[in-house]
Amino acid sequence: MPAQGSQRSLLGSLNSTLMATSSLGLSANQSGPQCLEVSVPDGLFLCLGLVSLVENMLVVAAIAKNRNLHSPMYCFICCLALSDLLVSVSNVLETAVMLLLEAGALAAQATVVQQLDNIIDVLVCSSMVSSLCFLGAIAMDRYISIFYALRYHSIVTLSRAQWATAAVWAAGILSSTLFIAYYDHTAVLLCLVVFFLAMLVLMAVLYAHMLTQACQHVQGITRLHKRQHLVQQGFGLKGAATLTILLGVFLLCWGPFFLHLTLIAVCPQHPTCSCVFKNFKLFLALIICNAIVDPLIYAFRXQELRKTLKEVLLFSW
């Protein structure tokens, strides 16, 4: 479990690489560029994790409670919430254990701590990979529902959605295990970066095509109305804003972490790259922020889910 300076590793397997690049960057920065390091207090980090944990637990509870939400679309949303929940749990657990070890409130053998760190690392990596996969699955589900509306229920069945989610979880566990085992191979890091870029391109293409189709649909409906241009312009701006939010949040929250991995593979000893490495904890905080924002974008906008969520909250009281 890392406990040196402000470097807190998301993946324990990267500890040696991160500490080496940090020390090299520090010595280089004495005569090199000034580094901007954004400090994220442990208290704030824990609070973000707990907010994400509670929020995603409510999403899972609401979907499990309401049988009307047992559909392929909500299956993907529920799995996204589970992935984000695991991201939050693993990061909160790792931070809490690290603070207890530093304070001397928790005594454990080095081998036990290392085993716990490896388990947390697998949880973190698998949940991150699965979270990205389910974001792509939600985009594909919405795309099929628009462009193949009449055949949607025959194409996207609940059983197929369940098989797809099982495959995603299995792929997440397998990829995280390989990543932990071969963390020092540049190809492994680059594969993760390519995977992220593929998900980004997939979401951008699908959502942009859906926006174009929606604008054409509105154009056909409003063709006979006098205020056709104003209606089309307003809808186009709203759709563009929605697309910008979807892709902007995705890129802002996930991009810095994968930029970090890219720089580890490309320029681990460069002074400028070492400046980026110093903000690794900030990149983790952004990923947890994504876990907070995901339910607001994909889950809480549904009226049926909001209604069930109120019932869950009233029942809990």
From Swiss-Prot:
Subcellular location: Cell membrane
Signal listed as a keyword: no
Positions in the Extracellular compartment: 1-37, 94-118, 184-191, 267-279
Residue positions with a glycan: N15, N29
Main location as per UniProt: membrane
Membrane-topology descriptor: Multi-pass membrane protein
UniProt superkingdom: Eukaryota
Keyword check for Signal: no
TM regions (residue ranges): 38-63, 73-93, 119-140, 164-183, 192-211, 241-266, 280-300
GO cellular component, one term: plasma membrane
Gene Ontology MF term list: melanocyte-stimulating hormone receptor activity
Any one Gene Ontology BP term: adenylate cyclase-activating G protein-coupled receptor signaling pathway
Function comment: Receptor for MSH (alpha, beta and gamma) and ACTH. The activity of this receptor is mediated by G proteins which activate adenylate cyclase. Mediates melanogenesis, the production of eumelanin (black/brown) and phaeomelanin (red/yellow), via regulation of cAMP signaling in melanocytes.
Similarity section: Belongs to the G-protein coupled receptor 1 family.
Subunit-structure text: Interacts with MGRN1, but does not undergo MGRN1-mediated ubiquitination; this interaction competes with GNAS-binding and thus inhibits agonist-induced cAMP production. Interacts with OPN3; the interaction results in a decrease in MC1R-mediated cAMP signaling and ultimately a decrease in melanin production in melanocytes.
Protein name: Melanocyte-stimulating hormone receptor
Organism, scientific name: Loris tardigradus
Lineage: Eukaryota, Metazoa, Chordata, Craniata, Vertebrata
